[in-house]
Amino acid sequence: MAQYILLLHQQPGTYASVPRDQMMEIIRRYSAWSDGLRQKGKMVGGEKLTASGGRHIRVKDGKPVASDGPYAEAKDVIGGYFVIEAKDDTEAEAIARDCPHLSSPTNWVELRPFDQMAVAQAKAAG
């Protein structure tokens, strides 16, 4: 089985004005979807990310420098992620297509495979 990450992209503030009862229903859909994948042995993990408070770490003059991200100007942000296991790209894409994140028309999911060779080499190196 290969591992993939689903990066959940959305516009800033997508859920800011959603009434509490609707937000609870959205959370319920995400939980049901991820629980279903977990029962099938396809879910490795995932988390919602905070809307603010992140930092960018970049190299400047050869040294890592931290700064607040330009989130206000961002056209989209990563609102969360899931790590899944799938037998191949086709199965991973089918899982991603079913993600409840896609219920909002401005949201999108980025599906990326993990470099399995690098993972295997790291495990072998101990």
Task: Please report, for each region that a protein language model flagged, where it lies by residue.
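Conserved, structured core segments of small domains
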Residues: 1-126
